[in-house]
Amino acid sequence: MKVFTGSAEAALNKAAEAVLSLVRTKPDCVLALSASSQLDGVYAALRESGADFSRCTVFLAEEFVNVEDASLTRRAKLEAAFLSQAGISRVHCPDAAGCEGYEAEIASAGGIDLALLAIGRNGRIAFDEPLAAFDSTTHVTKLTESAQQEECAAFGANPPSQGVTVGIHTLMRCRRALLVALGSERAEAVHKAVAGRTHISVPASLMQLHLNAELFTDEAAAAEL
């Protein structure tokens, strides 16, 4: 796994440049995108780039299950952060009742060219929590307390308890994977992901086995490397 370390701004811009490079060479590319708040700066850079994303196809990497307020969904967050302003209309979202169908949609689109993900404090990627099976495809999962604390602040005292996510195997099949980790609270997870043994207890560490994975961190997140 290649690692880029710099300021938070530099790391986010570098990740955005990787996405833009693909979009410019393959305008009809297929992207798997997480709605993690860690990626807000990447999406801001993409919005400001002036690039044409209209031919891209997007598959959301994760979504909450049984959320009544549509404005609190991962799709709504990603629409506000990037999709609507980028003019992307071909957007697919995982559904708890259609996991196999989601994999079929990805295959029908030609597979994922690039996945943009964040590393959680517990080493998760998307909603693939610790101990997610290496051969997992899109599936429903219980959200850990760590995930709820990081990604469910808008829900107040009643965060969703389940999510649906692309699986580790799904991500291993993507042609390129970009991971982002910022802040000292992710330093331990980054160390385990990059320098630790590959194990399902730290899903991000499994990306060491990916042939084209890159990690973008700031100095704080890379402090234990």
Language model features by range: what are they?
Residues L33-Q38, L117-R121, L182:
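Glycine-rich beta-strand-to-loop/alpha-helix junction loops that act as flexible
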Residues A45-F53, P130-V140, A195:
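A glycine- and small-aliphatic-rich helix-loop capping segment at beta-alpha/alpha-beta transitions
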Residues R124-I168:
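Class I SAM-dependent methyltransferase SAM-binding "motif I" and its flanking Rossmann-like core
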Residues V67-E68, G123-E129, A133-S136, E188, ...:
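Short acidic/glycine-rich loop or secondary-structure boundary segments that cap or lie
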Residues F53-L116:
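Ligand-binding beta-strand-loop-alpha-helix segment within the catalytic cores
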Residues T25-S49:
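Glycine-rich N-terminal segment of FAD-binding domains in flavoprotein oxidoreductases
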Residues H169, R173-L225:
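ATP/nucleoside-binding phosphotransfer catalytic cores, i.e., glycine-rich phosphate-binding loops
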Residues M1-L31, V91:
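N-terminal glycine-/serine-/threonine-rich phosphate-binding loop
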